[in-house]
């Protein structure tokens, strides 16, 4: 038997958009922002996706997204519109982890992982509140930076992909 809210979320998985839409609505209210502020980020993300030849957008749907298209899209769970939600695609990835000593003779230069972290907080309800999300993302960020021995100023780019665009203001 599955107890508590897990009985809902673990059986079929939680509906993707509504929780983040609720959190984003609260974010907009708290900080005086609007859904429209996401348009430059969303259109730039699509543009960048089209620049990646191995990516889905470049291979299967090489179409630009305009600000007008984004702002006019139908609501899925207000304030999350069609373009704030991931599209259903099948994907897989494989990563090989080894030690620096074993990787030293490889043709391809290895990538070093400095740290990893995740958040395993249990929300008070089925959907975490904005305060819970902000606290957990801050905690995860601190773990990542401290474990890697770097700060945000040491980074030259940010590449947090998530097909659900409204997550990004929390990271």
Regions found by a protein language model. Name each.
Residues 44-48, 161-164:
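A short structural micro-motif
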Residues 27-32, 140-154:
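Phosphate/pyrophosphate-binding loops at sites that engage ATP/ADP/AMP, CoA/4′-phosphopantetheine
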Residues 2, 39-41, 74-143:
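Condensing-enzyme catalytic core mediating Claisen C-C bond formation in acyl metabolism
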Residues 1-31:
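Flexible glycine-/small-residue-enriched beta->alpha junction loops
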Residues 38-45, 155:
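Short, well-structured alpha-helical segments that form the helix of a local strand-helix-strand
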Residues 116-118, 156-165:
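A short beta-alpha structural unit
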Residues 44, 51-91:
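Polyanion-binding loop/helix "lid" in catalytic or ligand-binding cores
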Residues 125-130, 162-171:
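Short glycine/threonine-rich loop-to-helix capping motif typified by GTGT followed
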């Amino acid at each position: 038997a599955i107890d508590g809210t897990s009985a809902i979320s673990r059986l079929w998985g939680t509906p993707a958009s509504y929780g983040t839409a609720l959190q984003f609505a609260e974010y907009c209210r708290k900080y005086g922002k609007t859904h429209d502020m996401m348009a430059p980020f969303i259109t730039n993300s699509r543009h960048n996706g089209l620049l990646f030849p191995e990516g889905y957008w470049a291979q299967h749907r090489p179409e630009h997204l305009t600000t007008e298209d984004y702002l006019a899209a139908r609501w899925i769970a207000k304030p999350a519109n069609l373009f704030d939600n991931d599209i259903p695609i099948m994907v897989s990835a494989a990563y090989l982890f080894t030690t620096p000593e074993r990787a030293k003779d490889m043709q391809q230069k290895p990538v070093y992982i400095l740290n990893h972290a995740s958040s395993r907080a249990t929300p008070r309800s089925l959907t975490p509140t904005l305060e819970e999300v902000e606290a957990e993302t801050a905690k995860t960020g601190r773990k990542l930076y401290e474990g890697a021995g770097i700060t945000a100023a040491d980074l030259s780019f940010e590449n947090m992909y998530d097909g659900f665009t409204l997550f990004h203001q929390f990271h």
